[in-house]
């Protein structure tokens, strides 16, 4: 039986944010929710997640301009350990479904920079470590992940900056 985990990378609300790029920092905020006691799981953040936030390393416009458009760079790994799903249920869990959403415009795999006066031409992307699948943020990318009642499952991702086009980034006032 499949159980849906409603969380980013285990979450489905518009909770991913590409804000703060105007202040030389960027955060990917990840909020999670698992509901219904009969279908619940224990979800533990791993990697560089700290209170649901992945802090990306500062990138300069020179560094960003040297990268190819659409490519992840200055990445950070994060993930979730999922275990103890539907403990005691008569219907064992064999898979979890991961839904992701966020603000994207021209490319569903790139989160828009929504910071006030933020840098133009740069966003944030996330990809699954196991197969380098780029996550889409428009709700179209439902990913099924295997689950073992004995071992649980590890959801592993990497996130980083992405140039959104070939034009050079310009410094923000």
Feature names for model-found ranges:
Residues 4, 20-173:
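Mature extracellular/passenger domains of Gram-negative fimbrial/pilin and adhesin proteins
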């Amino acid at each position: 039986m499949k159980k849906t985990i409603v969380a980013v990378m285990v979450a489905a609300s518009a909770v991913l944010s590409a804000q703060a790029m105007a202040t030389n920092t960027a955060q990917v905020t990840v909020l999670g929710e698992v509901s219904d006691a009969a279908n619940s799981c224990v979800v533990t953040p791993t990697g560089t997640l700290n209170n649901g936030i992945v802090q990306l390393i500062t990138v300069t416009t020179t560094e960003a301009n040297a990268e190819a458009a659409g490519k992840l760079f200055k990445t950070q790994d994060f993930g979730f350990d999922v275990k103890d799903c539907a403990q005691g249920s008569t219907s064992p869990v064999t898979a979890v479904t991961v839904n992701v959403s966020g603000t994207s415009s021209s490319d569903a795999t790139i989160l828009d920079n929504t910071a006030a006066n933020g840098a133009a031409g740069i966003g944030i992307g996330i990809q699954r470590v196991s197969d380098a699948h780029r996550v889409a943020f428009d709700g179209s990318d439902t990913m099924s992940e295997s689950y073992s009642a004995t071992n649980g499952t590890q959801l592993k991702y990497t996130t980083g900056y992405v140039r959104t086009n070939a034009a050079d980034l310009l410094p923000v006032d």
